[in-house]
């Protein structure tokens, strides 16, 4: 077990549900109902489900998944309140109890990272799509905040949900949606530079 690292995400509690062709932006997802819960109890429930599915008691890294306005819009206020009221402290307790090794965020936006870092210390942030060839928005404030706080930054979504892998083709996606004309133009410029 010491030869590899296991990470999981919390914030979404899964239960049995009907088979669907699409749900929450996922095509043909597993037949689960998803309930967002960033409270201490919700984090424990999601973590227990992950442990059972993964067949392990110890989780090296726990990411709080999709906290932020990118996913929740105006409802994010309620989720942030639940997280700050009991979720954050629950993660600290789980780490102190030796049930997890580290915790942080797994998100698609910079601002929620900065907001949570003001509340308390994280070990790691998994940031999707904000430090890529197309989107450099994490470059200044967030990187500096992570350096100041000693927080590791893991980059995810480095292809911006597809377009940096497919190129500027019909049906290309950027941030999980069809790419705009501007993004397509930006990618074409990158492709031209890469050919030189």
Predicted regions and their residues:
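Active-site mouth loops of central-metabolism enzymes
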Residues: 27-44, 74-80
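Short, flexible, mixed-charge acidic loops at enzyme active sites
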Residues: 16-26, 168-171
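Short, acidic/polar
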Residues: 39-53, 108-115
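N-terminal binding-site loop/beta-alpha segment at the start of enzyme catalytic domains
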Residues: 1-16, 25
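Beta/alpha (TIM)-barrel catalytic core signal, keyed to glycine-rich beta->alpha loops juxtaposed to Asp/Glu
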Residues: 67-196
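Short acidic capping loops at alpha-helix termini that bridge into adjacent secondary structure
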Residues: 2-4, 57-61, 101-102, 123-124
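Active-site groove signature of glycoside hydrolases
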Residues: 49-75
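Short amphipathic alpha-helices and their capping/turn segments at secondary-structure boundaries
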Residues: 1-5, 43-58, 139-152
């Amino acid at each position: 077990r010491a030869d590899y690292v296991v990470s999981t995400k919390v914030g979404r509690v899964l239960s049995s549900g009907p088979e669907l062709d699409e749900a929450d932006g996922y095509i043909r997802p597993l037949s689960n109902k998803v309930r967002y819960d960033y409270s201490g109890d919700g984090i424990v429930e999601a973590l227990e489900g992950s442990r059972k599915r993964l067949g392990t008691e110890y989780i090296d890294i726990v990411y709080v998944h999709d906290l932020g306005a990118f996913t929740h819009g105006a409802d994010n206020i309620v989720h942030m309140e639940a997280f700050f009221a009991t979720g954050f402290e629950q993660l600290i307790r789980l780490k102190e109890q030796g049930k997890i090794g580290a915790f942080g965020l797994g998100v698609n936006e910079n601002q929620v990272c900065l907001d949570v870092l003001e509340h308390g210390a994280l070990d790691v942030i998994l940031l999707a799509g904000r430090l890529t060839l197309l989107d450099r928005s994490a470059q200044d404030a967030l990187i500096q905040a992570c350096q100041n706080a000693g927080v590791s930054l893991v980059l995810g979504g480095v292809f911006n949900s597809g377009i940096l892998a497919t190129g500027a083709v019909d049906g290309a996606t950027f941030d999980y949606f069809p790419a705009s004309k501007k993004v397509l133009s930006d990618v074409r410029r990158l492709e031209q530079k890469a050919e030189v």
